[in-house]
Amino acid sequence: MPVKVGAPGAITPPADLVIKTAKRNEEKGYDSLWYPDHWMSWHPESIWTEDITPIAKFQPNPHVYLDPVATMAAVGVVTERVQLGTCVTEPVRRHPAMLANEWLTLDHITKGRVILGLGSGEAENNEPYGIPFEKTVSRFEEAITIIKLLWANDEPVDFDGQFWTMRDAVNGMQPYTPGKPPPIWTGAHGPRMCRITGRLADGWLPSLLTVDEYKEKLGIIRESAAKAGRDLSDFEAGMWNYAIVGTDHEDTHRILEATLLKAYMLVLGAEAYQKRGMTHPFGDDFHGLSDYIPTRYGRDETLKAIDQIPFELIHELMPHGTPDELIAIARDYEAVGAQHIMLWNVTFLGDFTKVGESFHLMDDVLAGIKSAV
């Protein structure tokens, strides 16, 4: 199966630009566009200042996100070929029945081009808003079961679970293509999430994994599927990661040192640091996205933490280099099983003067990956 290439969808106002960007990316040849489901950014607003990023001049805080369901509906009307997916939503804020209905709605609007990217959720998008955030992996597994149950039946159904109980619940809407509901991809990283993916999901979209880590976790998924008697011939293994692109490799090292880029490493759990002989700035008991709530970190505390992040960590986890080097990195992931690759250009967060150049260079990356198929 030829490798597919995805791109991030624009997710901040103005809406007209979101639509224009989607149409342009489809015309360029991207196979998919991906939209996060966030209320809160991974960057604390305490470091979202003009001395750190010029973006703060026209976007006063980092927590600006359009709703992905509404956005994909709008984009789906003006595009014809490109797939649209979330990277990722979750069943903590969104009830499984709501997800089932929303994605069937998108399925009809896009004429069968939508993907339900689903994860177990992040503390930042739930706990501050008064939404209980516990047993999220079990909730994630149960939600997939409910969604598939509702998609498979147009008659009333009952369900007795740990988190949800349904009596005489019905979803009468059928998929755009009869018998072919939207695929469910997971943002799985831990062993249990990967095993659930192998048993229940149709695709996989992890992030911030090295090639070796990717290979290991995909192996867990395949083993779990085999034990469940599942055929993975239609399963699609994706990968998305932040990327830095430039005309000079050493200059991308300079950009990697930028405050906002190193801040992405704060979302990792302590285990990711410990396995590399490093210590997480927030301590050995820090559980990454299960603990991280950026609005609760002041400027001094955040900058101190970022200063403690080893360069070797971001160098290893964030693809960077020239277009040819990024193409080679994509090929490395493809060699261990990746079938759908999305590189999220964040070069401009490290050097805003590179915004135009970096997106032009990403076009070269797209062309290179496609031409090597």
What are these regions (language model features)?
Residues 14-25, 99-102, 188-196, 256, ...:
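Short, acidic/polar
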Residues 5-9, 33-35, 84-86, 114-118, ...:
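Hydrophobic faces of well-ordered beta-strands that scaffold small-molecule active sites
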Residues 29, 37, 75, 106, ...:
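Conserved, mostly hydrophobic/aromatic
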Residues 136-175, 212-335:
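An alpha-helical appendage that flanks or caps ligand/catalytic pockets
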Residues 34-66, 90, 122, 127, ...:
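Glycine-rich, proline-tolerant flexible connector loops at the mouths of alpha/beta enzymes
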